């Protein structure tokens, strides 16, 4: 008879899937510090089981992960290091310095190559996990040396960060930049993967006691090994040698990125010569040595396979050439030239963003943060120079087209260049066009620096600056768009006149602007006329059927409409006379009030339905308080003006007549007479 199979305790169940941290440490026979380091290197994280059998306040791991750690090579090297330390102590006590020197040469070293290959089987997987790696390396590159963080680690991080930046400059793969309080956010497209990382701002970093630097350094060791692999692959993909030759003296002086590196593209001629020499040497060696018949057969088979592969590759190339479209000089296929015709000028041309600053020479002043601006400008095709750079370009040089300044007082103005604030560089990179200089000149408060990582929806709130930038981007030649910082000030005549007087960033003159405006006005009037004519035609068709019936009524209505129009004209004239001219302060106050009302409306929309009753209660109480305060103020004003609380005029009270003065002796006599009468 078959029955239910019973298991002993410890053979099956969810309890066996998990293991506590103390049990894992005992099983591996290592300290807690080494266990943490191993988990960080191997990517093993603590788990949260549904039923915590051995206590709620304990950390649990998968038992499979701990078994996986038992066969790790790093564990063997750690145990070998313990033995090495014991031998070192013995040799020091015995004063055998020769043997000690040989022992130090054979010291066991930890290598992380096999761990990186296990965790990232493909290069795309490594690129996906590069965000945290770059952020941590840039953080340690900007730190100061201390007892917890060594100088060698800081220099290695700085070198790796500069290598990655140099690759991005050469490949021109930077796309977005955003400066915030936390730091500077960058985003780049590297081999089809979007990588975003943050670099800290230049400040004196304080070592906080709450931070566990041991855990951070163990992460850093792994990320340094990963970054070397990634940089090697990226450099070789462009044709650069790795590791590149870096001038350490220039790196310590904080010289420019291009001057620090001396790496050149790999010369194909040298490689071809070396391959030819190697082939000739191998052929000579093969001629002298006796050849086995088996080896000959193998060589013949390999040559046949190679010839087949070459034929297949050639056939594929021929097919691709036949399938490729023959493109015209204007970028249009020859098959579709007839369809396009004369309207080829209206086709929008795609702008190459990587050459946004091509032909511009930027001079960065001393007060401006140089490293991030240099990185951004160079990655978009510009040229950079600054005081103390290797170029030896002075501020007076006439080749400089733009000077980035953050102080308005200490600047000698040159008429041959544009003076801009650092924000212009970041905003023009994010908007993918050169913004007008008038908003970023010296002494002017620049517009809002919007985040390029936020995607605005149609239903959500869109800032006024974003709307203005969209209008600039969507316009044909970036001339018809007008930038208004406040969308509600469009009706003000002063702002319209100022915008008309401003010169466009493309260098167009005032006459050309007037011609464009006239052209737009004529187009607008023509469209209005067409619409009005369509409406009239439709109304005439409907009115022809009803003319006979409603002839008399139409006459009366026309008379009433004329009377109403005369009254409305008189009212509008009176309103124009009565309306006072508002000052700028009053306009600003009105705009602030409108903005506050819009903000409250948006906040009300964002509140959840569950929490809306609380908001309504608070709103009612605030309104009651406001009304009570207003009534008290009104009563106080009435009392101060000499009225009652109800608003009635107070009657002044008549003064009482003073009682006649009576002496004390007379009072006593009067009292005595009263007593006698009684």
From Swiss-Prot:
Region (Disordered): 265-289, 485-601, 626-678
Biased composition (Acidic residues): 505-518, 541-574
InterPro entries: BRCT_dom, BRCT_dom_sf, PES
Annotated keywords: Coiled coil, Nucleus, Ribosome biogenesis, rRNA processing
Record-linked SMART domains: BRCT (SM00292)
Coiled coil stretches, renumbered: 581-640
A biological process from GO: maturation of LSU-rRNA from tricistronic rRNA transcript (SSU-rRNA, 5.8S rRNA, LSU-rRNA)
Pfam families assigned to the protein according to its UniProt record, in alphabetical order: BRCT_2, Pescadillo_N
Source species, domain of life: Eukaryota
Start and end residues of each BRCT domain: 352-442
Subcellular location: Nucleus, Nucleolus; Nucleus, Nucleoplasm
Principal cellular location given in the protein's record: nucleus
Database matches in PROSITE patterns: BRCT
Basic and acidic residues bias spans: 519-531, 585-601, 633-643
Entry GO CC: nucleoplasm; PeBoW complex; preribosome, large subunit precursor
Compositional bias (Low complexity): 269-289, 649-678
Molecular function via GO: ribonucleoprotein complex binding; RNA binding
Protein family: Belongs to the pescadillo family.
PANTHER family: PESCADILLO - RELATED, PESCADILLO HOMOLOG
Role this protein plays: Required for maturation of ribosomal RNAs and formation of the large ribosomal subunit.
Protein's recorded name: Pescadillo homolog
Native species: Dictyostelium discoideum (Social amoeba)
Upper taxonomic lineage: Eukaryota, Amoebozoa, Evosea, Eumycetozoa, Dictyostelia
